[in-house]
Amino acid sequence: MSIMSYTGGTVVAMAGDECVCIASDLRIGEQMTTIATDQKKVHKVTDKVYVGLAGFQSDARTVLEKIMFRKNLYELRENRNIKPQVLSEMISNLAYQHRFGSYFTEPLVAGLDDTNKPYICCMDTIGCVSAPRDFVAVGTGQEYLLGVCENFWRENMKPDELFEATAQSILSCLERDAASGWGAVVYTITKDKVNVSTIKARMD
């Protein structure tokens, strides 16, 4: 078994009309043994920018600490909130610096910029960025998510529609991926607020 799928976990993000959704499952395991059922893989960076970390969760915790350190340093120097595009480049540089002994985690960035334009991207373990305009997914359930997201995603979806599409996509993934599960948490980021919803799913 690959170290990338050792602890399991899936993160997905979708872009809408001045809104984005990012969701993850809640399971952390040791291969097929479930260790905990409340492991959130999505973390707040600013009020409008969130990062999801799939892969080996020990490395994900280390990467998160480094991301927050660099983000705080950036905001002290620049005296402004970090944009999602800048954060993705920062994480990409961090990953590429460690390419010869890379962190076993796949980061995903989702958020709104200063004009409330949605931005989503994901990257591999050495920081190669993929930034489509529709949806991204990382983790053990990625192969199950992409086709489902293709079916649910529409252009210019409003927050309620986007939440429904993201929630249905991750629930469909949790039905099929044995390394993810025990419910999901969905963050809907709009220009005014962030809604956090916890969804029940299969408990096996």
UniProtKB/Swiss-Prot annotation:
GO biological process annotation, one example: proteasome-mediated ubiquitin-dependent protein catabolic process
Localization (cell): Cytoplasm; Nucleus
Keyword terms, alphabetized: Cytoplasm, Nucleus, Proteasome
PROSITE patterns: PROTEASOME_BETA_1, PROTEASOME_BETA_2
Pfam families xrefs: Proteasome (PF00227)
Subunit structure as annotated in this protein's UniProt entry: The 26S proteasome consists of a 20S proteasome core and two 19S regulatory subunits. The 20S proteasome core is composed of 28 subunits that are arranged in four stacked rings, resulting in a barrel-shaped structure. The two end rings are each formed by seven alpha subunits, and the two central rings are each formed by seven beta subunits. The catalytic chamber with the active sites is on the inside of the barrel.
Protein task: Non-catalytic component of the proteasome, a multicatalytic proteinase complex which is characterized by its ability to cleave peptides with Arg, Phe, Tyr, Leu, and Glu adjacent to the leaving group at neutral or slightly basic pH. The proteasome has an ATP-dependent proteolytic activity.
The family this protein is said to belong to: Belongs to the peptidase T1B family.
Protein name: Proteasome subunit beta type-3
Organism this protein belongs to: Caenorhabditis elegans
Gene giving rise to this polypeptide: pbs-3
